[in-house]
């Protein structure tokens, strides 16, 4: 489980953050100053990478949050088994299975190279190469 800790004020739209134990892509950040003596608060809205659920949190801008270390890799399709696909990583030659996203179901054939991401022990197929 690779992650690092940063302050909320360094987060940007399009980057990733861990909310409720899930890696999520930030879709919106808004900050507000509550008053004369209060510290600024940030509201961060994000969508889960692996489950597509909307999540959000409100924290002071100087508080710390975890961000995932996302590893983008290339793999080759070995076999297609119903709703799952068996892939082999082209660097480590490790084989694993992952669900097929709806938008890639027509493009996947055996032998084609694909890109996938790995974060917090989970993998997701992103797109075909070429």
UniProtKB/Swiss-Prot annotation:
> Which GO terms of the cellular component aspect does the record hold?
cytoplasm
Q: Which residues form a coiled coil?
A: none
Molecular function in Gene Ontology: ribosome binding; RNA binding; translation elongation factor activity; translation initiation factor activity
Location comes to: Cytoplasm
Electron transport is among the record's keywords: no
Q: Which residues carry this modification: Hypusine?
A: 36
Keywords, comma-separated and alphabetical: Cytoplasm, Hypusine, Initiation factor, Protein biosynthesis
Q: Record's Pfam families?
A: eIF-5a, IF5A-like_N
User: Can you cite a GO biological process for this protein?
Assistant: positive regulation of translational termination
Q: Where does the UniProt entry say this protein principally localizes?
A: cytoplasm
Q: What does this protein do?
A: Functions by promoting the formation of the first peptide bond.
Q: Which family does it belong to?
A: Belongs to the eIF-5A family.
Stored HAMAP family: eIF_5A
What's this protein's name? Translation initiation factor 5A
Q: Which organism is it from?
A: Methanothermobacter thermautotrophicus (strain ATCC 29096 / DSM 1053 / JCM 10044 / NBRC 100330 / Delta H) (Methanobacterium thermoautotrophicum)
Instruction: Write the lineage as a comma-separated list.
Output: Archaea, Methanobacteriati, Methanobacteriota, Methanomada group, Methanobacteria
Gene designation: eif5a
């Amino acid at each position: 489980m690779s992650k690092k800790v940063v302050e909320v004020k360094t987060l940007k739209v399009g980057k990733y953050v861990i909310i409720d134990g899930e890696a999520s892509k930030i879709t919106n950040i808004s900050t507000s100053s509550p008053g004369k003596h209060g510290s600024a608060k940030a509201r961060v809205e994000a969508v889960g990478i692996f489950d597509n659920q909307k999540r959000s949190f409100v924290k002071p801008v100087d508080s710390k949050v975890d961000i995932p270390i996302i590893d983008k890799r290339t793999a080759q399709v070995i076999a297609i088994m119903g709703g799952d696909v068996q892939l082999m990583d082209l660097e480590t030659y490790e084989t694993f299975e992952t669900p097929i996203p709806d938008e890639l179901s027509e493009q996947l054939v055996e032998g084609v190279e694909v890109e996938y991401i790995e974060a917090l022990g989970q993998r997701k197929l992103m797109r075909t190469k070429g």
